[in-house]
Amino acid sequence: MNIAVVGLSHKTAPVEVREKLSVPEDGLEGAIAQLCSYPHIEEVAILSTCNRLEIYIVTSETESGIREVTQFLSEWSHLPLRELRQHLFILLHQDAVMHLMRVAAGLDSLVIGEGQILSQVKNTHKLGQQYNGIGTILNRLFKQAITAGKRVRTETSIGTGAVSISSAAVELAQLKTPCLADCRVAVLGAGKMSRLVVQHLLAKGANQIAILNRSTERARELANQFSEASLQIHSLAELFNVITRYDLIFTGTSATEPLLDRSKLEPVLEVNQSLMIIDIAVPRNVHANVNELEQVQVFNVDDLKAVVAQNQESRRAMAMEAEALLEEELTAFDVWWRSLETVPTISSLRDKIETIREQELEKALSRLGSEFAEKHQEVIEALTRGIVNKILHDPMVQLRAQQDRETRRRAMQSLQMLFNLPVNDSVVNVNS
C-alpha cells in the first residue's frame, strides 16, 4: 500500500480553475463513493476549501490509483486532462504525509498560520469516516496531522495575530475606500466567513451593515452574535431590490452558481452609483462579466495576496520553528506505518500460540474432572491467557519498534522459521 495526494491550490491554480473542482459538502458522499469504486483505491479523503482541493488516497498500485483520481477530477470539473494536469500536484507517502501536516498547521495557507484550516481538516476526517472513505491508514494519518496542527498552534506563536481570508478582505476594502465608517455595507451569506467579515468590519469602524441570506433565521442568528451593533437583515431574494442602498458588498455564500452577473446587475444599478464587491467564495458568487460594468469594482480571493504578503514575512521565522514540530509528528507516523509490515507475522504467531493454549487448556480441564473444571475454568483461562500475553509482549514490542527495514525483516523471518509460521505474501508494502 502507498499513500498519495493529488490536488491543486492557490499556489498552482487561479480561482477560475479552483472553483470548477470545488466539492461542496453535500456532494462529498457521492464523490467519495465514486472514488472508492475504482479498483486501485482502498481509502480516500477529500479536503475542499476556497483555496485548495486535495484528494488523499491509500492505493495498492500507486500509478493506477493516481490515474484514477486524475480521471475523476477531469470528469468532476469537465476540464480536459491536458488542461487539468498543468495545475495539479502529486505527492507520495512521506511527502504526502508531511504536506497534510503542513496544511493542518496552516503553513501551506494563503495566510500563514490561519486557524480555519485545522477545523476544515477535522471536518474532512469526520466526513471521510462517516461516508466510509477513511480506513485504518488515513484515520491514523489525519489524527496525526490534527495533532501536529494543534501542537504548532499551542507550542509556537504562529497563530498570534494571523490574518484570515475574511480579515484580509476587510483590509482590502479599507485600502480601497476612504472611510469604512461612511460605507453602507452588505454581507451576503451567514456562515463562518461572513461572521468573521462582520466582526472585522465592526472592529474597523463600519456601522452600516446588512446581512443577506437565503434563510433570514440564520442571518438573524448571526446578527444576534453582535448584539451591540444594529445590523439589518434581508432575505437574499431581496438582493436586487435593495442593492442600490450599498457601496460595498462582501459575498461568501456556498452557492454553486454565481449570484451576481452583468445581466442582473446592470438594470438595477443607478447611473452614478459606484459599487465595490469583494467575493471570497469558491466557487465565486460573482461572475467575471461583472468586471465589464464601469461603475463596479470586483475583487476575489486571488486579489487578497497583495494584502496578505504584508503579514507574511514576520511569520516565516515562526514557520521554521513549526517545521521542527512537524518532523516529530512525521517520525511518529512513519514508525506506526512501518510497524504495519509486522502485522501478518504477529497475527500468525498470536493465532498459533492461542490455538496451542486452547488445546492444552482443554486437555488439562478434562483431566481435572468436570466438577473442578466448572468451578475453576475462568481462573485457569485467565491464568493461561495472562502467561501467553506476557510471553508475547516483549517480542512484539521489539519487532514493531525496529525502524531499520532489513533488521525488522530479518526478525520476522526468524520468527517465521522458529515457530514454523506461514510466510504471508500480503505484507503491507511500506516503501517510501
Curated annotation (Swiss-Prot):
Which Pfam families does this one have? GlutR_dimer, GlutR_N, Shikimate_DH
> What residues correspond to the site Important for activity?
99
Q: Where substrate is bound, by residue? A: 49-52, 109, 114-116, 120
Q: Which domain of life is it from?
A: Bacteria
Q: What is its EC number?
A: 1.2.1.70
Q: Which UniProt keywords apply?
A: Chlorophyll biosynthesis, NADP, Oxidoreductase, Porphyrin biosynthesis
Q: Which GO terms describe its biological process?
A: chlorophyll biosynthetic process; protoporphyrinogen IX biosynthetic process
Instruction: List, from the UniProt record, the residues annotated as the active site of this protein.
Output: 50 (nucleophile)
Q: What else is known?
A: During catalysis, the active site Cys acts as a nucleophile attacking the alpha-carbonyl group of tRNA-bound glutamate with the formation of a thioester intermediate between enzyme and glutamate, and the concomitant release of tRNA(Glu). The thioester intermediate is finally reduced by direct hydride transfer from NADPH, to form the product GSA.
Per the entry, what this protein does is: Catalyzes the NADPH-dependent reduction of glutamyl-tRNA(Glu) to glutamate 1-semialdehyde (GSA).
Protein name from the UniProt record: Glutamyl-tRNA reductase
Record organism: Cyanothece sp. (strain PCC 7425 / ATCC 29141)
Q: Which gene encodes it?
A: hemA
